[in-house]
């Protein structure tokens, strides 16, 4: 039973890495800096409820943030999101 649980955890971790790692790489500039506007939305790890905004590649979209974790593609207002991420 312990081996099956371990293998299941390894498989889950592998899938999460395969999904997350390419998204992080595509958000990286050539000089190694991360463009926060290209990161996926990150709801965070807690169960609190904060309405925030993230840039989805074209526009700013509202999402629920849990209050801890996530990433820097998170803004308190649509205006702040557009100011940082919208291209003129």
UniProtKB/Swiss-Prot annotation:
- What are the BPTI/Kunitz inhibitor domain coordinates in residue numbering? 37-85
Q: Which SMART domains match?
A: KU
Signal sequence region: 1-27
Instruction: Provide the residue ranges of the propeptide in this protein.
Output: 28-33
Family matches, as CDD domains: Kunitz_huwentoxin
Q: In its UniProt entry, what is this protein called?
A: Kunitz-type U15-theraphotoxin-Hhn1h
Q: In which tissues is it expressed?
A: Expressed by the venom gland.
| Keywords noted in UniProt | Disulfide bond, Protease inhibitor, Secreted, Serine protease inhibitor, Signal
Cystine pairs annotated here are 37-85, 60-81
Q: Which family does it belong to?
A: Belongs to the venom Kunitz-type family. 03 (sub-Kunitz) subfamily.
BP GO annotations: envenomation resulting in negative regulation of voltage-gated potassium channel activity in another organism
> PROSITE patterns, from UniProt?
BPTI_KUNITZ_2 (PS50279)
What is the purpose of this protein?
Serine protease inhibitor that inhibits trypsin at a molar ratio of 1:1.
* Annotated organism of origin: Cyriopagopus hainanus
Which residues are annotated as site, described as May bind Kv1?
A: 39
Q: What Pfam families does its record include? A: Kunitz_BPTI
Q: Does the keyword Secreted apply?
A: yes
- Subcellular location field: Secreted
GO MF assignments: potassium channel regulator activity; serine-type endopeptidase inhibitor activity; toxin activity
Q: Does the keyword Secreted apply?
A: yes
**Which residue positions does UniProt flag as site: Reactive bond for chymotrypsin?**
47-48
One cellular component term from this protein's GO annotations in UniProt: extracellular region
